[in-house]
Amino acid sequence: MKYDHLLVRYGELTLKGSNRKKFVNQLRNNVNKSLKGLDGFVVKGKRDRMYIELEDHADINEITYRLSKIFGIKSISPVLKVEKTIEAMSAAAIKFAQQFEENSTFKIDVKRADKNFSMDTYELQRELGGAILKHFDNISVNVKRPDHEIRVEVRLDAIYMYEEVVPGSGGLPVGTGGKTLLMLSGGIDSPVAGMEVMRRGVTIEAIHFHSPPFTSDQAKEKVIELTRILAERVGPIKLHIVPFTELQKQVNKVVHPRYTMTSTRRMMMRVADKLVHQIGALAIVNGENLGQVASQTLHSMYAINNVTSTPVLRPLLTYDKEEIIIKSKEIGTFETSIQPFEDCCTIFTPKNPVTEPNFDKVVQYESVFDFEEMINRAVENIETLEITSDYKTIKEQQTNQLINDFL
């Protein structure tokens, strides 16, 4: 079947009132960015639907795949746009039926947005079903459990006919909900947390704490790859890599061993808080899950959060670990997340970290050293990378450069 349009159904933005135009415009911009590099199509965003007009050479499968990854889209259907005459509709219905297997069953489903159309729903079903039955002897109707369902939408401008409905990613268009800073560790949880807030229309930049030589270049490349996977959904993402060795060593030098994890997290939050103000973000996002590890109890969260007045969003707070793993596999980050390269949160983990840290104690331990200068130095020396969906890892870039230099 050669389709001439893609019908794109909106997600939650259909619930928006006077702001709907803003959401539709943002979604159209996101669609155009996602389809960059492809040709043979024209995007037409309307208030209630988006239509993508296809030329003969358009790669409909690739376009549909990319659309399915965009937040704000509920579903996509390859459609035939048909004139509002029974003759044109019957001819299109026969085209669909030509693709059916022998002895298969079908039904006609009609939705009339144009209530002034000359035929009602039942009449259309009868006429189109009758046209198919007259043309084929080995096809029958089954309205309860059909093998095929031809869907017909009667709209003001034309008739749209289709069979397939491809699920989209739902949510709201990225860019409509403000900017956040994602604390990206390299584990399973934080990429999922980033994906969850992006699904609510939020733009993200990511921050990662790197402690060489205790953490390897492979750990850094792992985080770059996780960012690249997230960028497949939303376009380029800035990744801020913080040189954290000096701060982490000092924490382990002056803070009681049971409190080093709490204090380390507080230092991370202080660095993140400064970066939030630099980039104009409105919140910090992390993958914390209540009670999962020692640093994620309510007592720990209270002690850690105390260093910032910036809102901290925890979209995975109440998830079961198995739920997070399932989502990680769905979004394509799981296999990268489980690569055995340690991050700075795991290399200095104490044997018996405190699970209910006393806030006054952690402040007392940190008071023996003025960390502010180190924190400012870490922020000043941040390495910022813009990660795109086709971003090559540092190792690949270096290898290519060496090859080019050699040649």
From Swiss-Prot:
Its name, as the record gives it, is Probable tRNA sulfurtransferase
A GO CC term attached to the entry: cytosol
What keywords tag this UniProt record? ATP-binding, Cytoplasm, Nucleotide-binding, RNA-binding, Thiamine biosynthesis, Transferase, tRNA-binding
* Gene symbol of the encoding locus: thiI
- What are the THUMP domain coordinates in residue numbering? 61-165
Keyword Hydrolase carried by entry:
no
* SUPFAM superfamilies assigned: Adenine nucleotide alpha hydrolases-like, THUMP domain-like
Describe which pathway this protein belongs to, using the record's wording: Cofactor biosynthesis; thiamine diphosphate biosynthesis
**What is the organism lineage in this UniProt record?**
Bacteria, Bacillati, Bacillota, Bacilli, Bacillales
NCBIfam families recorded = tRNA uracil 4-sulfurtransferase ThiI
Task: Tell me the compartments it is located in.
Answer: Cytoplasm
Q: What is its EC number?
A: 2.8.1.4
MF GO annotations: ATP binding; CCA tRNA nucleotidyltransferase activity; tRNA binding; tRNA-uracil-4 sulfurtransferase activity
Which InterPro entries does the protein's record reference? Rossmann-like_a/b/a_fold, ThiI_AANH, ThiI_fer, ThiI_N, THUMP_dom, THUMP_ThiI, tRNA_STrfase, tRNA_sulfurtransferase_ThiI
Pfam families attached here? ThiI, ThiI_fer, THUMP
Q: Which family does it belong to?
A: Belongs to the ThiI family.
Q: Which GO terms describe its biological process?
A: thiamine biosynthetic process; thiamine diphosphate biosynthetic process; thiazole biosynthetic process; tRNA 4-thiouridine biosynthesis
| Catalytic activity entry | [ThiI sulfur-carrier protein]-S-sulfanyl-L-cysteine + a uridine in tRNA + 2 reduced [2Fe-2S]-[ferredoxin] + ATP + H(+) = [ThiI sulfur-carrier protein]-L-cysteine + a 4-thiouridine in tRNA + 2 oxidized [2Fe-2S]-[ferredoxin] + AMP + diphosphate; [ThiS sulfur-carrier protein]-C-terminal Gly-Gly-AMP + S-sulfanyl-L-cysteinyl-[cysteine desulfurase] + AH2 = [ThiS sulfur-carrier protein]-C-terminal-Gly-aminoethanethioate + L-cysteinyl-[cysteine desulfurase] + A + AMP + 2 H(+)
Identify the residues that bind ATP. M183, L184, H208, F209, R265, G287, Q296
Function, as annotated, reads: Catalyzes the ATP-dependent transfer of a sulfur to tRNA to produce 4-thiouridine in position 8 of tRNAs, which functions as a near-UV photosensor. Also catalyzes the transfer of sulfur to the sulfur carrier protein ThiS, forming ThiS-thiocarboxylate. This is a step in the synthesis of thiazole, in the thiamine biosynthesis pathway. The sulfur is donated as persulfide by IscS.
